[in-house]
Design a protein with these regions (language model features):
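Gram-negative bacterial Sec-dependent N-terminal signal peptides
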Residues: 1-22
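M16 family metallopeptidases and their MPP-like homologs
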Residues: 55, 60-78, 82-86, 100-147, ...
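Short, conserved charged micro-motifs
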Residues: 134-136, 236-240, 295, 352-356, ...
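Short, conserved secondary-structure transition motifs
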Residues: 163-171, 262-276, 382-393, 603-604, ...
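Proteolytic maturation boundary segments
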Residues: 23-53, 235-275, 286, 317, ...
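A common structural junction motif
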Residues: 142-152, 247-254, 363-373, 618-624, ...
Length: 958
């Protein structure tokens, strides 16, 4: 559906509009690609009104269980904003016959890709489970649909009000975090169901009562207002009796009256200027246009994609690449039922005249609306998006799989085949229709928002930690209360025994694909695994580089080089690269992580050869043009400023260098962006030399997963990489012998006045390498802090309500690995939260070791979820690369069940106790020092004040 494709476009790159040279071969036609997108399914409806969609996909022993309710924030009346989302949280706190946390059950049945989300038009809940646990999942979903009311308590409600309030604060605390409130509150008039944000008002949330929540459930959570999708190792004949068994006896609920709301138009242009802690000025242009079912929406989607969504978009070409007055530009459409949001935004280059950029943006937009896109632009939009949809068909559930496509169509327009019709519309789009739609809808009055660097207004909070950012909103004029029938959805029509939880009936074995190996004539090793569920192929050419290869005085060079490799080759401009990708429906990218630099390709099978040509050109022949280098430098410097303007960015930049020391390969910011002064000093010769010595055939390995064979792919790789040689010697091995500083327990406090939350990041470099067997240690950490059900998350989030989410993790690395704890917490509980983390770690290593129940849950959950973990070819590709990095055999995934089953509580306790010493943890806290420091002083640890701006290579020496 367009909705899914639009969200994918939010992450797309940018490039120039020069005409690419003709391809040696003709790419597959768009119509052929559309034919490959197919989700056959059966539909049936229970007597109580529950609509059920079943799609059969036997590639793995898993089933996606996804349930969508026709209720969202649009259904919230006056004084109850945020209730739809708050109730989504309540749904995870246990039902009458499944008491306790919902995730307690999903963990022990091996669920993957699980969550719940709320948006304007819907609330959904989803999980992918082993086939043997399907009945378990149906029991859980049906129990919270039909048997929730008696399990909802004031204590649970109060806790989730705290959790959601901290979720809101966490979002508001990000750069540009307040813009969406201004957009919805201005574009949609008072009384429109989209006038307020989904997260709602803290004032309204704090006033929520137990009766409010129970009535919300009664009014909206009947089976007749829901769609259940089962996709995977199941068919309708198997599904019907199970669905009837668990859902059939739930009584029909109240009918939810449809919401009817016209598309609003502003009376006149509105200009708003906001201040925020942002690296540069951002300019917005916003309109409301028709909802997702309107034919004009498809045309607008195409037009906006060509304007600012494609890698070759016009905005990026003109403002970012040619005129270089901006460091980023995008345009996209987010579709909803009662109106869609058009968002066009430009990030002004630091030092450029924002007024001039805004004027130029409006000129470009006016010209584009007048002339429309070219036929080739329309074709590239269609090809690239349909190819992405094909790739998405590999996943049955999750946030964007086949279950989502079916459910959205059925819920929003009453047609589960809507995804196919949308793609057919996309393939048939014409420039004339696109131009007409833009002239009709984008010439109306516009909302112009400008966010400038500066201090945002003081974040106000009132008693009991509640406050209001969106204000108390009027009742939507188009809100229609549910029918007045006196029935409760919690009352069953007849008895169904729910006294015993249906445990999984077995443990499906993981069938990890066989990895074949070969070697090209120049010595490059190739590793191949076949996955043919969809006609796509993924290729990763991995180099032993990464930002651990950055010299200490050139931190950021690996990231700069990676970006530059896609910005033009000796035969193609950056625009021509982007346009070629779009014509082929391919995705070519280069990126660096800590230990590796990887050039990746996702290709549709019919265009594999042409796509490999492009990948090879990007790897072997980058031009590193000086003008492109200067533009990329400004973008990277702006990225550094952006990282320094958000709490998490500050923390992950500052703490790792202190832990490892500035001379260690891991002693730079873990974002890989480097420091402003090192990036400013990197010259073209530096980048060329780095590429010559690190992107070298002697440091390369090729990984391939997809719908091909080693016999077919090897000759294709041999032609493109087998004769590749270099006159230069490869770079020497990274110097991991550099000593890591002795760990020191202290608190580093970075002051951010008026911050609504504090960000706590704690760390320790462990005496362990990534190639060591860390499974036992990671299993112990899963219980301590690595999982939603972990001790620290359940304490700080589910018991105390001080945080939206807390985690600890043991990162992967080629050399010594770090242990981190991450906790965004409300300001007035910062000190107590740190004490909780310290005490929990001490207790874990001492008086409260791993329990038998925790061990069983960890073993069972990890074993059962193995088939779901490797459903997608991208996961197989990632596992292959991880195995190679960590010197493991390629059948490692298939040995995991045995390894987990062999774990003992004593082994987990010993692993954590030996490796993670609470007295050696370094703490970095970003927050309002005036409010936070007195709390921290009570902990008795040394406190060092660190200036927020002092984030240079010199300031991060150990």
């Amino acid at each position: 559906m367009i909705r899914k494709l639009t969200l994918a476009l939010l992450m797309s790159g940018t490039a120039l509009t020069a005409q690419a040279p003709a391809l040696a071969q003709t790419p597959a036609p768009v119509s052929k690609l559309v034919d490959a997108v197919n989700i056959p399914h059966e539909k049936f409806t229970l007597d109580n009104g529950l609509t059920v969609l079943v799609h059969e996909d036997r590639k793995a022993p898993i089933v996606a269980v996804s349930i969508w309710y026709g209720v969202g924030s649009k259904n919230e009346p006056k004084g109850k904003t945020g209730y739809a989302h708050l109730f989504e949280h309540i749904m995870f706190n246990g039902s009458e016959n499944a008491p306790g946390d919902y995730f307690e059950y999903t963990k022990k049945i091996g669920a993957t890709d699980l969550n719940g989300t709320t948006w304007l038009d819907r609330t959904n809940y989803f999980q992918t489970v082993p086939t043997t646990a399907l009945e378990s999942a149906l029991f859980l979903e049906s129990d919270r649909m039909g048997y929730l009311l008696n399990a909802v308590s004031k204590e649970k409600l109060d806790n989730q009000i705290g959790v959601v309030s901290n979720e809101k604060r966490q979002g508001d605390n990000q750069p540009f975090g307040l813009v969406s409130y201004t957009q919805s509150g201005t574009l949609f008039p008072v009384g429109h169901p989209y006038h307020h944000s989904t997260i709602g008002s803290l004032e309204d949330l704090s006033a929520a009562s137990l009766d409010d929540m129970k009535n919300w459930f009664i009014d909206h959570y009947g089976p007749n207002n829901a769609i259940l999708v089962l996709a995977g190792d199941i068919n309708a004949a198997q599904a019907k009796p199970l669905v009837e068994k668990w859902f059939g006896k739930i009584k029909r609920g109240k009918d939810v009256a449809p919401v009817n709301a016209p598309v609003p138009t502003l009376e006149k242009d509105i200009k708003i200027v906001m201040k925020d802690k942002v690296p540069t000025t951002r300019i917005y242009r916003n309109w409301v246009v028709p909802g997702l079912a309107d034919p004009d929406t498809n045309s607008l989607f195409v037009g906006l994609s060509a304007l600012g969504g494609l890698s070759s978009s016009r905005l990026d070409n003109i403002l970012v690449r040619q005129e270089q007055t901006a460091v980023g530009a995008s345009a996209y459409l987010i579709p909803f039922v009662h109106g869609s949001l058009v968002n066009i935004q430009v990030d002004v280059k630091p030092g450029a005249d924002a007024d001039a950029v805004a004027k130029r943006l409006d000129q470009i937009l006016a010209d584009y609306i007048k002339t429309g896109p070219t036929a080739e632009e329309v074709q590239r939009v269609a090809t690239s998006n349909i190819a992405a949809q094909i790739d998405g068909l590999e996943q049955v559930g999750g946030f964007g799989g086949k279950a989502v496509a079916l459910a959205e169509g059925q819920l929003y327009v009453g047609d589960s085949d809507f995804y196919k019709k949308e793609l057919q519309r996309l393939a048939a789009a014409k420039p004339t229709a696109v131009k007409a739609a833009m002239q009709k809808w984008l010439t109306r009055p516009v909302l112009e928002i400008r966010v400038e660097p500066g201090e945002r207004e003081v974040y106000k909070e009132v008693a009991a930690g509640a406050g209001s950012r969106t204000g108390t909103l009027s009742s939507p004029a188009f809100y229609a209360p549910p029918g007045s029938e006196d029935n409760l959805v919690s009352s069953p029509l007849s008895f169904q025994d729910r006294s015993t939880f249906p445990e999984p009936t077995g443990t499906p074995a993981l069938d990890f694909p066989t990895v074949e190996e070969t070697t090209l004539s120049n010595g490059i090793k190739v590793f191949f695994a076949r996955r043919a569920a969809v006609p796509t192929v993924r290729v990763a050419v991995s180099f032993n580089a990464g930002y651990a290869a950055d010299p200490a005085d050139k931190r950021g060079i690996a990231s700069m080089m990676s970006t530059m490799m896609s910005e033009g080759t000796t035969s193609l401009t950056s625009t021509q690269i982007a346009e070629t990708e779009e014509k082929l429906g391919a995705d070519v990218s280069v990126g660096s992580s800590l230990d590796r630099t990887v050039a990746s390709l996702r290709a549709v099978k019919p265009n594999l050869g042409l796509s490999l040509d492009l990948l090879a050109d990007v790897i072997k022949n980058p031009a590193f043009a000086t003008n492109e280098l200067e533009r990329v430098r400004v973008q990277q410097l702006t990225r550094i400023k952006s990282e320094n303007n958000q709490p998490q960015g500050i923390a992950v930049r500052r703490l790792p260098p202190l832990l490892y020391g500035k001379g260690h390969p891991y002693g730079g910011p873990q974002t890989g962006s480097g420091y402003a002064e090192t990036v400013a000093a990197i010259g073209r010769d530096d980048v060329v030399n780095f590429h010559t010595s690190w992107v070298h055939p002697a440091k390369a390995e090729i990984f391939v997963v997809g719908d091909t064979s080693l016999k077919e792919i090897k000759p294709m790789l041999e032609v493109r990489f087998g004769k590749w040689t270099s006159n230069a010697a490869p770079a020497p091995a990274k110097n991991f012998a550099v000593a890591v500083p002795a760990p020191e327990s202290r608190i580093l406090l970075i002051d951010r006045p008026n911050s609504p939350q504090s960000l706590v990041l704690a760390g320790l470099v462990l005496d362990a390498k990534g190639s060591d067997d860390l499974l036992t240690l990671r299993a112990a950490n899963e219980i301590f802090g690595g999982d939603f059900l972990s001790r620290i998350n359940m304490d700080l989030r589910e018991t105390k309500g001080w945080s939206y989410g807390v985690r600890s993790q043991i990162n992967g690395a080629e050399d010594r690995v770090p242990f981190y704890m991450f906790a965004p917490v409300q300001t007035n509980q910062t000190g107590p939260s740190v004490k909780v983390l310290i005490d929990q770690l001490k207790d874990f290593n001492g008086v409260k070791p791993v329990t038998a129940a925790e061990l069983e849950k960890t073993i069972k959950g990890n074993v059962l979820k193995l088939p779901g973990n490797y459903e997608q070819s991208s996961a197989v590709l990632g596992q292959m690369q991880s195995d190679r990095l960590n010197k493991r055999p390629f059948n490692y995934a298939e040995t995991l069940a045995g390894k987990y089953n062999g774990l003992t509580a004593a082994a987990l306790n010993d692993a954590m106790r030996v490796k993670v010493d609470p007295s050696k943890i370094t703490w970095l806290i970003v927050g309002d020092a005036a409010k936070v420091k007195p709390q921290l002083e009570a902990l008795g640890l040394p406190i060092e004040m660190v200036t927020e701006a002092a984030n240079t290579s010199a300031s991060n020496s150990a």
